[in-house]
Amino acid sequence: MSVLRGLIVKRWSSDVRLDGKTAIVTGANTGIGKETVKDLANRGARVILACRDLVKAEQAASDISKDVENANVVIRKLDLADTKSICEFAELIYNTEKSLHLLINNAGVAICPYSTTADGFETQFGVNHLGHFFLTFLLMDLLKHSAPSTVINVSSLVHPMGKIHFEDLNSEKNYHPVKAYVQSKLANILFTRELASRVEELGVRVYAVDPGLVNTDITRHLMKPVQFFVKTFGFMIKTPAEGAYTTLYCALTPDLPTGSYYSNCTVASCSRAAKDDNSASKLWAVSCHLLGIRWR
């Protein structure tokens, strides 16, 4: 069993310190996000937990402070399903932070029943892609000011199943929870690709990561047979701490090729659709149109 886990989980460690650095982690109250915050705080970073549920965020911050001596963690309200909340969060960051060296777009919803965001977008596309797209847009000036800086978009190993349905991005014609989810995860990689090409010369690096198959709260909407598999074959599934390895690898390893996709702490091959520069450019333009912004 230990041999199998060795194939599934690539162990990785680093002694890099982050004293004087500031990081934002979305969806930081549980799972991979919480473990990411813990590691960054342990390296001396000031870490902002960007969370929708402040009660859960307070508990996460308390847990981290117990594990990490003198942890510099701060809680901020962020609802990625509401552009007004995203604007308020960004305004608060500019008013309270002098720099931002690391933005980890980790939050996500998965395979949930059909619903829409406050702005009318299908929830998985709206939160997983558009919410983080808008957040990154609003924080880009601070990231550029703090360069060298890094943006990390958490995608998924299931992105090859995805297709960008430009004619029905919000799944209004035909909603299927899995199709909507994999579309959003493919969008994460296309966004990474396009953003990297635009900001590399400004000192901002951008990476997409696959955390692997991880046992987290995001599985709560999965069908019962899949939940049974997760529980039965748990030894094959990463812990949240293990799921954070690749995010941390990209955050802490210097000179990695920007715009690339990483899995198990190494650069990985993504699907043909995820390498389509025309789709990446089109998704960028459509996302700007949907959000009512101009981002050149």
Where are these regions (language model features)?
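Amphipathic terminal alpha-helices
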Residues: 280-296
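C-terminal helical subdomain
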Residues: 184, 208, 231-279, 285
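Rossmann-fold NAD(P)H-dependent dehydrogenase/reductase core
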Residues: 2-223, 292-296
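Residues within alpha-helical segments
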Residues: 24, 58-61, 91, 193, ...
